[in-house]
Amino acid sequence: MANTLEQLKLYTTIVADTGDIEAIKRYQPEDATTNPSLILKAAQIPEYESLIDNAIDWAKSQSDDLAQQLDDASDKLAVNIGVEILKLVPGRISTEVDARLSFDKEQSIAKAHKLVRLYKEAGVDKSRILIKLASTWEGICAAKELEKEGINCNLTLLFSFAQARACAEAGAYLISPFVGRILDWYKKDTGKDYDAVNDPGVVSVTEIYNYYKQHGFNTVVMGASFRNIGEIIELAGCDRLTIGPSLLEELANSQIDITPKLVAATSTVAAEAPLTEAQFRWDFNQDPMAVDKLAEGIRNFAIDQGKLEVMLTAKLAN
């Protein structure tokens, strides 16, 4: 009998949620995703020292202004790590726009253009990149414009149906609904434990997946942020699942019989008129979990971006 991970790959595209090249070699995912927290973690791996040095040298060659050097070094490091990962995966790398731009459409678009340019200079076509943006109204609007330019986007920090619907209506290539962080909120709020079938994160992704398929939206659903393999098994059949190394290892070392739980609708019905900004903000605001977790997610990514910049500042000073 094939292990659980190999069975899962029959129904769902598996993506590695890591910047760790050794983990990617081990589990052979189709794609990989990174975020500011994972880049910070990866930057502390000794094997990546040369990638950091390259980013620092490049940044110094671009400008004499320290703030600009820091911005450039940070972007270049994320791209350098992405380029290394793309040597190992046949599909795409997701690289995230600075979380501090989550409420600035124009600056998010400018940062996306810069990341695409840096990848191009490194010999990587935009067809192998997904630009990650927070699923704020501004992030979704930025994605809408980028998609029209042929720059595919991954809308992340997605916790609510309103966010998912707006992303699909904007023509986003892919969304990353967060499963485990939804579970965290409900466990803390209710004091209850949930089995995988009733896990609020699993229920949320299932609802989004079914809505997309019923209404003929092409936006890819990629479940993210898992707390246990039970959540993953309950989402077998989802378009993609991005999974961290520890859970990939657990799946590879287990032999649980997998059957697809999410199955695409065979017929579609017309979607409703797209949400207006006012409708989106109201619907989103009605979900206290989503409001809390989006704000927290943006803050935490910004904190880790700041930690990375402290490390890079020290290196730029040398």
Curated annotation (Swiss-Prot):
Catalysed conversion reaction? D-sedoheptulose 7-phosphate + D-glyceraldehyde 3-phosphate = D-erythrose 4-phosphate + beta-D-fructose 6-phosphate
Q: Which residues of this protein are catalytic?
A: 132
Disulfide-bonded cysteine pairs: these are none
PROSITE patterns noted in UniProt: TRANSALDOLASE_1, TRANSALDOLASE_2
Tell me where on the tree of life, at the top rank, the source sits.
Bacteria
Annotated metabolic or biological route of this protein: Carbohydrate degradation; pentose phosphate pathway; D-glyceraldehyde 3-phosphate and beta-D-fructose 6-phosphate from D-ribose 5-phosphate and D-xylulose 5-phosphate (non-oxidative stage): step 2/3
Q: What does this protein do?
A: Transaldolase is important for the balance of metabolites in the pentose-phosphate pathway.
**PANTHER family assigned:** TRANSALDOLASE
UniProt lists the family membership as follows: Belongs to the transaldolase family. Type 1 subfamily.
What protein name is recorded for this chain? Transaldolase
Q: Which organism is it from?
A: Shewanella baltica (strain OS223)
Q: What is the lineage of its organism?
A: Bacteria, Pseudomonadati, Pseudomonadota, Gammaproteobacteria, Alteromonadales
